[in-house]
Amino acid sequence: MQTTTINQDTKWVLDPTHSEVYFKVKHLMISTVTGQFKKFTGSVETDGDDFSTAKIQFAANVDSISTNNEQRDAHLKNGDFFDADNHPRLIFDGDKLEKIDDEEYALYGTLTIRGTSKRVKLNVQFGGLTNDPWGNTRAGFSVSGKIDRDDYGVSFGAVTETGGLLLGNEVKVFAEVQFVKQEVLEEVA
């Protein structure tokens, strides 16, 4: 006798109009410059509403980087930094979301910048689930973490006259994101 079970896979699509992705890096080691990626996509696949089973895909368009300074943005896009012509996207593939408590998670995955992929751990705060006025279920998350830009070949290393670094190597990354639920039923024999 053959049995058929129905697994409910849920896809969540990132809502870019209610999300932002940004970073902070030390400048001259005395102040912080903030930048953001204005164009990005993302999705999450879960087993129902259980985010501990999440598989996450995210990509940011490097050409959309903005620090509110056109000259600096152009420099960030060139070969000294992100090399947008050869590496147009920054990619994150999350493969493990470890629940710490009801609101806190540790997210593990692979971050690819300039063609270099490294494992990273990010901190995630679950903001909750809610229904919007149009009948959609939404999930909100705050994501934060730190990476070393040298690990990804983003190693522009100008030094000041006094021997100090022009830019810090540690980059703090942040995302405030909303995902919209889209259910897909999959039949497994």
Functional labels for PLM-detected ranges:
Residues 1-189:
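Low-complexity, acidic/polar, glycine-enriched regions of mature
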